[in-house]
């Protein structure tokens, strides 16, 4: 397994919508394994394929150490391919989020408290998952990446521009 390079804002790839995967193959699984290793290396809760430069609708998530819900031992890591949010609660919960593609920034984001998704798993099997609390937030954050949306897109344009200027300076090692 390889550690993949992280794409950071303002890279334009992060603003593009990712493409559906036709089938989960051995090659797809190897890529997901590399994504997982990269996510652990970055100490992240989740990772979308676009964050490593691949515009495919693939997510990996592992929050087992922070999930308040008791789950089966083999529940994590989650490999989520072609996710579709098929239901979401009307109740919104606001929380502070960070993102490895938006380094050194934290943003308050309001998201539905619970969601239901359908997706393909690691073995190309159709699955449905109801998630709430922290897992719902992580899935929605990563799902936004697949749609070309970053957490800073929830900010006002003025605040977003300030963050983007900071990120450009950081990228150019001016900070």
From Swiss-Prot:
Its cofactor is Fe(2+). The keyword Transmembrane does not apply. Fe cation binds at residues 99, 141, 145. CDD domains: Pep_deformylase. InterPro entries: Peptide_deformylase, Peptide_deformylase_sf. Binds 1 Fe(2+) ion. GO terms for biological process: translation. It holds the Pfam family Pep_deformylase. The active site is at 142. It catalyses: N-terminal N-formyl-L-methionyl-[peptide] + H2O = N-terminal L-methionyl-[peptide] + formate. It comes from the Bacteria. Its EC number is 3.5.1.88. GO terms for molecular function: metal ion binding; peptide deformylase activity. The keyword Membrane does not apply. Belongs to the polypeptide deformylase family. This is Peptide deformylase. It comes from Rickettsia canadensis (strain McKiel). The lineage of its organism: Bacteria, Pseudomonadati, Pseudomonadota, Alphaproteobacteria, Rickettsiales.
């Amino acid at each position: 397994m390889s550690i993949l390079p992280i794409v950071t804002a303002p890279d334009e790839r992060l603003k593009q919508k990712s493409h559906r995967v036709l089938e989960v193959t051995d090659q797809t699984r190897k890529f997901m394994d590399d994504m997982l290793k990269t996510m652990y290396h970055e100490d992240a809760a989740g990772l979308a394929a676009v964050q490593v430069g691949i515009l495919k609708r693939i997510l990996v998530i592992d929050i087992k150490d922070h999930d308040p819900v008791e789950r089966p031992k083999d529940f994590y890591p989650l490999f989520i391919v072609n996710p579709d949010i098929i239901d979401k609660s009307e109740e919104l919960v606001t929380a502070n989020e960070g993102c490895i593609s938006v380094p050194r920034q934290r943003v308050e984001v309001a998201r539905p408290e619970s969601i239901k998704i359908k997706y393909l798993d690691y073995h190309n099997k159709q699955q449905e998952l109801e998630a709430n609390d922290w897992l719902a937030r992580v899935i929605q954050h990563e799902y936004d990446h697949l749609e070309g949306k970053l957490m800073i897109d929830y900010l006002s344009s003025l605040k977003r521009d300030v963050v983007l200027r900071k990120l450009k300076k950081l990228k150019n090692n001016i900070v």
